[in-house]
């Protein structure tokens, strides 16, 4: 698969190649319109949002900027996903969910039969589209009402370990690293005030974004009672911070090393929670990246 988010996720979800499943890139050229389009954009099912209102300049994802509408769905995926097949095999009884920091990651893994939720860079909510639901479940509304991301107002991304513990030769400030208008190219990285247009983007480009997604996932497991009967349930959690950090700072950055170290702790927290609520002996855990990452040309 091509090294892009939607391509890798859909290949994992379907077991098919891009030529078969249809997701050949994050954006591609549409012959009918003569324009580039975003992979999972679908104008028919609009975004289901409890708090609407866009922050001007909040979107920094070049693929997302191609979107002309907020609607999202898996209708462009041409092959059945594992989750679709599981739903059929259990006569529709399996509970199927996919969550992520990115919409395209969640949509691909949920397939047509599951429910996808993803983080908003506008308000920090976990959101979905009306393709999946007509209204948020109470537990989702309750989680969003807690406004956990906003509690990081004025805080910063700090190194997990003392600077000397990181790999030698990784300088914490290179001219090719991206500064998200005040996030900086070296530690600590300030999130800034919660009303800053890039506040939620900065949070998601850090280990805090993964921790917020984990907390949402824990609430999902409890509220939907996953794994509590003899029917196989399915949950995909796509942590997005490593991808974002690599794009902005590069694979050889101190930021990348730190976000991986912190993700390791987040995964340990997840596994402990699953063991407590479901039992690891009752759970099949599959780990995978969705794609690789080349070094920054200036570094290589």
Regions found by a protein language model. Name each.
Residues 16-17, 23-231, 240-247:
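His/Asp/Glu-rich, glycine-adjacent segments
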Residues 1-11, 98-107, 238-240, 289-292:
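Short, solvent-exposed turn/loop segments enriched in Gly/Ser/Thr/Pro and often Arg
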Residues 262-300:
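Metal-dependent active-site segment of extracytoplasmic phospho-/sulfohydrolases and closely related
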Residues 8-12, 78-82, 92, 213, ...:
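Stable alpha-helical elements in mature extracytoplasmic
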Residues 4-7, 230, 280:
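Short, solvent-exposed loop/turn segments at the edges of secondary structure
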Residues 232-237, 283-285:
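Generic beta-sheet signal
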Residues 111-122, 249-257, 292-300:
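Short secondary-structure boundary/capping segments
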């Amino acid at each position: 698969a091509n090294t892009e988010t939607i391509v890798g996720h859909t290949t994992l979800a379907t077991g098919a190649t891009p030529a078969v499943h249809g997701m050949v890139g994050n954006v591609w050229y549409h012959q009918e319109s003569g324009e580039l389009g975003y992979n999972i954009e679908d104008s028919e099912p609009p975004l289901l949002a409890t708090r609407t209102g866009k922050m001007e300049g909040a979107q920094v994802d070049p693929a997302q900027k191609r979107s002309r509408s907020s609607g999202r769905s898996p209708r462009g995926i041409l092959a059945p996903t594992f989750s679709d097949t599981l739903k059929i095999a259990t006569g529709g009884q399996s509970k199927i969910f996919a969550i992520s920091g990115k919409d395209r990651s969640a949509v691909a893994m949920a397939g047509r039969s599951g429910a996808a939720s993803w983080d908003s860079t506008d308000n920090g909510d976990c959101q979905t589209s009306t393709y999946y639901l007509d209204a948020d479940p109470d537990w989702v509304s309750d989680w969003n009402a807690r406004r956990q991301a906003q509690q990081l107002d004025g805080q910063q991304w700090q190194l997990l370990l003392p600077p000397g513990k990181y790999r030698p030769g990784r300088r914490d400030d290179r001219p090719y690293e991206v500064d998200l208008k005040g996030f900086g190219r070296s530690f600590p990285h300030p999130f800034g005030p919660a009303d800053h247009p890039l506040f939620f983007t900065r949070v998601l480009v850090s280990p805090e974004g993964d921790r917020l997604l984990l907390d949402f996932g824990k609430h999902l497991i409890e509220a939907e009672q996953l794994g509590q009967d003899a029917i196989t349930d399915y949950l995909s959690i796509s942590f997005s911070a490593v991808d974002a950090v690599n794009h902005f700072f590069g694979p050889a950055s101190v930021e990348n090393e730190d976000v991986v170290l912190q993700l390791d702790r987040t995964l340990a927290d997840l596994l402990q929670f699953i063991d407590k609520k479901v039992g690891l002996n009752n759970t099949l855990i599959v780990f995978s990246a969705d794609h690789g990452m080349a070094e920054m040309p200036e570094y290589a």
